Amino acid sequence: MKLAPAFPRSYFMGRFWAGNTTGDGLEQTWLDGYYRYTKRGKVFARKTELNNWSLIFPSELSHDWRNLPLDQISFQHWAQEGGKIKHHTVLTKAHSKVALLFAKKELLLAVQKILVKETLSLLPGIIGDKWVSLDLMQVCSDLVIKLNARILYGPAYADDQDFHKRLITFANGVDGINSIYFTWPRSLWKIVSLVHPTIRGFYANLPHLKKRMLPDIRSRIAKLQAKAAQGEGKVPASDEDVTFMTALIKMHMEEGTLGEQDSDLEKVCMEAVFYTYEFWGPIMPTLFFMLMAIGKNPGYLQALREEISSALESNDWSSDFLARTPKLESFIREVLRLYVPAQWLITDIHRASLATVSRRTEKPIYVQSMDMHIPAGVNLCVPAKYIHRDPDFYPNPTTFDGFRFYDPVTNNVTIRATTATDTYLSFSHGSGLCPGRVFGAHVVQVLCAVFIMEYDVKVDPSKTFPDVQSTKEGRGDGMVGTTDILIRKRTSAKV
């Protein structure tokens, strides 16, 4: 068995390049590993929570495994076996298929109309004609959770603030309870789950979500069955049809995976709830950094405003205007490259991963490029944050360049915001490429466009621009810098 040169003895023990695994030195340890091993085409290992191991590959050498079939290597298994997710939510194939379904233009434009309508009705109550300092993270959270409830579940949930709070409690808790479990041996998890107040609170919240949603799920099943009996084309679509929850139910019905028992419906309910983790979780901080980047770099505001205005022209917000905004698409790709370098995981604020293209081996695999045998149960990943900030790939990589991917000669983007490459891994790569990337990027661009056209924003130059620092293995858990922004309504806004 030939292994990476970083590991001279047994498979892991003795091959573990230690450094700091927690605390302030963690990011420097990863950076050192990147230049000592990744840049030299070598693999290095890190010991993570619960004595698990991760092998960190150079991106170009992940080709051998990132497209392997799910029975050999799986992102979902990495996500669910990494902690306790599988104990409250079982994700099915239908779950991912719905995310892909909402990447279709017809549904994107239907969602876009909802986004603009709800955003324009909510923000005037917060933002007036005078400059006001707001906690932008909180504004984005409040806005996105409302949109999250409306688009994922339906209009009846859009103004239910208790429901919104419970959704956020769930989304934060998915990683929050894992962080607690990871501080204890796996053998003690059952006891910890019984006595720790955070874990008890997380699970105590679930019955409330189910009580709110299960009657609605049963009602939607009955309506979908009635539509099927009448012929779907004869029944007008309702507002609740343009929701992830209805689409998920319909997908399960079509695939014959929708059981009739209460326990089966509860599983569908938790799958639907989990969409909040995947919607509010990454969309909220991405929108936050988009607006903060505009506030810090006011030169972009006018250029983006002119582009969006031209794209809208005589059309309204329901038009496919994003097809004509290459500068805005370049802008979001740069935000995703620099400020949101990998999959976002949520805690009290949020977390940003140091690595992506995360997989867990289901069976022993062989990596031909490294002549390397890897046993089952090992986590594999790529150091995305450091690739994204490598000057060999991006000139002046730590400097924000909103039009880095815009070509003024052709007036087009050089690469789409959601396209993965070996040096751009915000949405992972290979078979685990984020199925919701097109939908998520579209939502953020629409919301950002509304802000650009309706509001002026600026950042106090005396305050430190926000960033995320990692102090726990594989995750960032601390926001540094300001989350405040100055904002006011434009006097000549486009409604």
Curated annotation (Swiss-Prot):
SUPFAM superfamilies, per the entry: Cytochrome P450
Entry keywords, A to Z: Heme, Iron, Metal-binding, Monooxygenase, NADP, Oxidoreductase
EC number(s) recorded for this UniProt protein: 1.-.-.-
InterPro entries assigned: Cyt_P450 (IPR001128), Cyt_P450_E_grp-IV (IPR002403), Cyt_P450_sf (IPR036396)
Keyword NADP: yes
Any one Gene Ontology BP term: mycotoxin biosynthetic process
Known pathway: Alkaloid biosynthesis
Family classification: Belongs to the cytochrome P450 family.
Function: Cytochrome P450 monooxygenase; part of the gene cluster that mediates the biosynthesis of communesins, a prominent class of indole alkaloids with great potential as pharmaceuticals. Communesins are biosynthesized by the coupling of tryptamine and aurantioclavine, two building blocks derived from L-tryptophan.
Protein name stated in the entry: Cytochrome P450 monooxygenase cnsC
Source organism: Penicillium expansum
